[in-house]
Design a protein with these regions (language model features):
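Short, Lys/Arg-enriched N-terminal segments with co-localized hydrophobic residues
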Residues: 1-14
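Short, hydrophobic/glycine-enriched beta-strand segments
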Residues: 15-23, 49
């Protein structure tokens, strides 16, 4: 099903999967729900943000399936959504950081903390593409559900991501070029 099998040794921790996606995706189809069920069945920890769209839909899925191993990441400890009243991972962000960069701090923390990624992407979301790029930079496997074509692909390196971007529409290639020009959101001092 695309997920690595890992035997959890005594004193080890469950795999952490950063699950995120586009804000304009308001429901999860059966394929995405099947993948989420697989994550839950394997006992992986789910790291999710507090935004509307895919974040809140993943929270709804976990809540309705009584899945408890969820951490909600929120800037300054104030989640916009926490449907299951799960533990909140606070990401401190100064008042001088605004807009996209404000929310990307939380995403950077989830990229850093996760072992794997699962992204539900509309092919246009800058934030989701930034997460995929950051996970690839760290050599972390990411399953990407491409909602426009209903297909799942694997990416684990910048080279694999660039091959994917090369077959995307011009709009997506331009978006990736913009992201590549920005410094990575990962910092040793975050």
């Amino acid at each position: 099903d695309g997920w690595p099998v890992r035997i959890i040794a005594k004193g080890d921790y469950p795999m952490k999967v950063f699950v995120a996606g586009s804000k304009n995706i308001s429901s999860l189809n059966s394929e995405v729900q099947r993948r989420l069920s697989s994550i839950c069945e394997k006992g992986y920890s789910i790291l999710v943000g507090d935004c509307y769209g895919v974040d809140s839909q993943v929270q709804e899925f976990c809540f309705h399936n009584n899945y408890l191993d969820v951490s909600v990441y929120a800037n300054n400890g104030l989640p916009r959504n926490n449907i299951g009243a799960w533990p909140v991972k606070t990401i401190i962000v100064t008042a001088s950081v605004k807009d996209f960069e404000f929310y990307s701090k939380k995403d950077a923390a989830m990229c850093r903390d996760a072992d794997y990624g699962y992204m539900v992407w509309d092919g246009r979301s800058k934030g989701t593409l930034r997460n995929i790029a950051d996970l690839a930079e760290q050599g972390k496997m990411t399953l990407i559900y491409l909602s426009p074509i209903h297909k799942t692909v694997h990416v684990q390196s910048k080279e694999e991501l660039e091959k994917l971007i090369a077959v995307c529409p011009a709009e997506t290639r331009a978006l990736y070029s913009k992201i590549e020009l920005q410094p990575t959101q990962i910092s040793l001092f975050d």
